[in-house]
Amino acid sequence: MRRISLTSSPVRLLLFLLLLLIALEIMVGGHSLCFNFTIKSLSRPGQPWCEAQVFLNKNLFLQYNSDNNMVKPLGLLGKKVYATSTWGELTQTLGEVGRDLRMLLCDIKPQIKTSDPSTLQVEMFCQREAERCTGASWQFATNGEKSLLFDAMNMTWTVINHEASKIKETWKKDRGLEKYFRKLSKGDCDHWLREFLGHWEAMPEPTVSPVNASDIHWSSSSLPDRWIILGAFILLVLMGIVLICVWWQNGEWQAGLWPLRTS
């Protein structure tokens, strides 16, 4: 068998290292925008029936409530967004989405097994990697119970709680509703994410402590930090295996010269 010399294949190793760096960039370079809505079927006077929190890369920077129909900026990022033309559009959209979600809650309330006032928790999520949208989804919980997941990328529903099966069938039949969810998460959310990232990347460092978004998000398009670390570790191990194989075939392992070859 022809021996493969380490010095005769530098291009191969450089290409492998380049692919490794690209893979790591894709894994850790993702950005996300998350809108968390809490909708109440009934609210006391002076208390909002809709509240929303907006997270960029898990950092809370905007808050909204229906009582005054205003968006409150938080931290330096929130103040930067406040000074843009996007602010008015965002305020209007949050109000419209809140009203639409409240109508959905009224529609499904008879299917919720409780006589008490009901709440609907909704998370709209979008993600970008390598300059493109790689994730868009909606997650729903009724009265704190996780119920449904809608993947706007492939227009599919997942039932989390079997009691939400009827709700899922009702919404699935409404093609206009599905298109509405897709437009908001894959269209508007992704557009805002691109806009906000310009301000995020211009900041020297996050000025708002990371706050985890609602734990009702289970989209497979979002990679948890532990999986990013595990993936990077696996890639490094694979690189080590390839290098060992090259040195082994070059006969340096047996000669006791690995990894001290200088020529």
UniProtKB/Swiss-Prot annotation:
Entry comment describing in which tissues the protein is expressed: Predominantly expressed in the skin, but also expressed in testis and trachea. Up-regulated in tumor cells of different origins. Expression progressively decreased after treatment of tumor cells with retinoic acid.
Key word Methyltransferase present: no
Membrane-spanning parts: 226-248
Principal cellular location given in the protein's record: membrane
Family: Belongs to the MHC class I family.
Disulfide bonds: 126-189
Protein name: Retinoic acid early transcript 1E
Gene: RAET1E
Keywords linked to the UniProt accession: Disulfide bond, Glycoprotein, Immunity, Membrane, Secreted, Signal, Transmembrane, Transmembrane helix
Functional note: Binds and activates the KLRK1/NKG2D receptor, mediating natural killer cell cytotoxicity.
Pfam families: MHC_I (PF00129)
Cytoplasmic topological intervals: 249-263
Topology relative to the membrane: Single-pass type I membrane protein
Record topology, Extracellular segments: 31-225
